[in-house]
From Swiss-Prot:
Entry protein name: Cysteine desulfurase IscS
Key word Cytoplasm present: yes
Localisation: Cytoplasm
Residues the record marks as active site: C328
């Protein structure tokens, strides 16, 4: 077993060796290095063919038509293109948008920008388990609601929303439905032929592909229109200009192909490991799982260890790579806004650790993690006067702390 142990697969994944090998054939003079937009020679044709194959591999995983796949620089750009693109195109029909408070910043900040442009956004609060109440969603829909954006799997707590039911509510209201599926693609069965999803954001590096490339699914029937946010040579049917990075696209395609092939065997394996981790940690006093355990990614476990500061715990866990909050926002000292939206107090939100398992996680690593966690929590609580007070039966909420 090699230390440190990587348990932060929701932040990024290593590139699968098979993917890296495939990508290498599209970089040098001996490889297929052409510009897919070069229509006058073999170098361009070969590159275009490679892009087409990757487009089909991505479409195959999600039950889409390859013509519905638009390549972007990543899921953040896909979210921006979907939300701004649809809002701007359909603004004559209305200016109301619905989203949820636990969405990724790429969705929330894009909605904030649209508010500055005169759009109105309803931010739904999830239930305590992280799920959206469908009745509340239905009640938020209005005749002028042009767009709803709800993520499939949450990046912090791994909770899976019922995108089938939400999509049907949107379709009945003639509202465009965007899903951020960055965390769920390749981990959960998605068949867009059966879902009323109009736009779907995807990433490559969350599924063992390279960083710097992603895709947006744009439905053809019923056709969804977008206003471009990057202008230029009219690539990607005018929706996203810019020379296509063939090696990255090929890598993403190969990663999606592997995921389709191995998903049925890999997800039960990860669920068994995740449950092993949970069973090993749940007996620690004052630990709380964040988010529904029933409707959740098999690879995610988010636990709050009360009376332990999350940052101190992470420092004590030098041999394990985990995160306390989303990788995109963990640079700030604010407690996780996702956990706050579930109703957790600052202390519990600050004491949360996200474990996300992946393709290279082993049983040995999980057992090592359990032992290390138990020791670290015990050690830090031994240093905590709050823990002593709690053990003495003092209700800490009744204490008035003096301000400094």
């Amino acid at each position: 077993m090699k230390l440190p142990i990587y348990l932060d697969y929701a932040a990024t994944c290593p590139v699968d060796e098979r993917v890296a090998k495939k990508m290498m054939a599209f970089l040098t003079i001996d490889g297929t290095f052409g510009n897919p937009a070069s229509r006058s020679h073999k170098f361009g044709w070969q590159a275009e063919e490679a892009v087409d194959i990757a487009r089909n591999q991505i479409a195959d995983l999600i039950g889409a038509d390859s013509r519905e796949i638009v390549f972007t620089s990543g899921a953040t750009e896909s979210d921006n293109l979907a939300i701004k693109g649809a809002a701007h195109f359909y603004q004559t029909k209305g200016k109301h948008i619905i989203t949820c408070k636990t969405e990724h910043k790429a969705v929330l900040d894009t909605c904030r920008q649209l508010e500055r442009e005169g759009f109105e956004v309803t931010y739904l609060s999830p239930e305590a388990d992280g799920l959206i109440d469908l009745e509340k969603f239905k009640a938020a829909l209005r005749p002028d609601t042009i767009l709803a954006s709800i993520m499939h799997a949450n990046n912090e707590i791994g909770v899976l929303q019922d995108i089938k039911a939400i999509g049907e509510l949107c379709r009945a209201n003639k509202t465009i439905f965007h899903v951020d599926a960055t965390q769920s693609v390749g981990k959960v069965e998605i068949n867009l032929e059966e879902l009323a999803v109009d736009l779907m954001s995807m990433s490559s590096h969350k599924l063992y592909g390279p960083k710097g490339v992603g895709a947006l699914y744009v439905r053809r029937k019923p056709r969804v229109r977008l206003e471009a946010i990057i202008h230029g040579g009219g690539h990607e049917r005018g929706m996203r200009s810019g020379t296509l990075p063939v090696h990255q696209i090929v890598g993403m395609g190969e990663a999606y192909r592997i995921a389709k092939e191995e998903m049925a065997s890999e997800m039960p394996r990860l669920k068994a490991l995740r449950d092993r981790l949970y069973n090993g940690l749940k007996d620690i006093e004052e630990t709380y799982v964040n988010g529904s355990m029933e409707h959740r990614l098999d690879s995610n476990l988010n636990i709050s260890f009360n009376y332990v500061e999350g940052e101190s715990l992470m420092m004590a866990l030098r041999d394990i790579a985990v995160s306390s909050g989303s990788a995109c926002t963990s640079a700030s000292l604010e407690p996780s806004y996702v956990l706050r939206a579930l109703g957790l107090n600052d202390e519990l939100a600050h004491s949360s650790i996200r474990f996300t398992l992946g393709r290279y996680t082993t049983e040995e690593e999980i057992d090592y993690t359990i032992n290390l966690m138990k020791g670290a929590v015990e050690k830090l609580r031994a240093l905590s006067p709050l823990w002593d007070m709690f053990k003495e039966g003092i209700d800490l909420n009744t204490i008035e702390w003096s301000a400094h």
